[in-house]
Amino acid sequence: MRKKVLEHYLQTSTYTYAGAYGDYFRSLPDNVAELGRLVCSQVIHRVTLHEGNTNANAKLQYGDMTKFPWYRMRCEDDILMTAAAMTAELFRLDKRGFVPDRRVDNKIVVTCRYVSVLMSAILKAKNIPCRSRAGFAPYFQPERSMDHWINQYWNAEEKRWVTIDADGFYDENGMNLGQYDIADGKFDHAAKAWLDVRNGSVDGTKFLYADGLGTCSLRAVIRALFYDFHALMNDEISYQFQPCYIDNKFEQLTEQDFKELDELAMLLLSPDENFEKLVHIWETEKKYRIMNSPLVGDYDNLGRW
């Protein structure tokens, strides 16, 4: 792997910057699987909280959900956007920090993007190149692939990217995923999903965006495509961040727009080999970076590219 690429994935964003927690992150376990299990022990996924002590939590592996305070928000994604914010809240709730025996009422409720950001922040602080990735996980529901975020870290000894998913105790629950060294093909990367739907080789309804509205196919994949592109450029945007030119404008996109995204997806299939081309697009294609968010919209952004 080229030094330039690895150096890029040591850099941090607003989201992954450790700040005052750098030394603390470096004190956490160096074994990635052990670290992932520790991080997982600090969080509750909003779906797990909603389902209570059933399904994935039938054995209370994530804790007794009846003990979660009624007055706490049922999902804290909107509040804890950065690794530093999540870490600060964990220390506020339990001054011991990251501990395997954290009580349910002291855990934070965040989803996969946030666990991915936290893992990226910790590994980068340890001087291990790491990147968050967005796509779809086919291992949650039969015949469906759910929008999901994971990580890849550089194993210097083996000279390869290792794909991991620290968002749950999947292996312990018998999923047979190998979640701390996920084999190629077990995760649906956004670029391949986009191209497969575009060329008709895969039924797009397989890919589902978990908004509760049934959003699927290209409408779902276009979101993941930009999540992944931004994450590869060390800008791990959250779910409600989308380029202004596509935000709530899917029906207005032209075939030329789709062809441009086909070209972006082709490059994203091999992000290391196409690193310079992706960086060039990142630095020059304004419409891919001018973002709408919950508070910034068309009023602020239209006409800026």
Set out the residue ranges of the language-model regions.
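His-Asp-centered catalytic microenvironments across diverse enzyme cores
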Residues: K3-T14, G36, S41-H45, N55-R72, ...
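Generic structural signal for short, flexible, solvent-exposed coil/loop and linker residues
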Residues: G97, V117, F140-P142
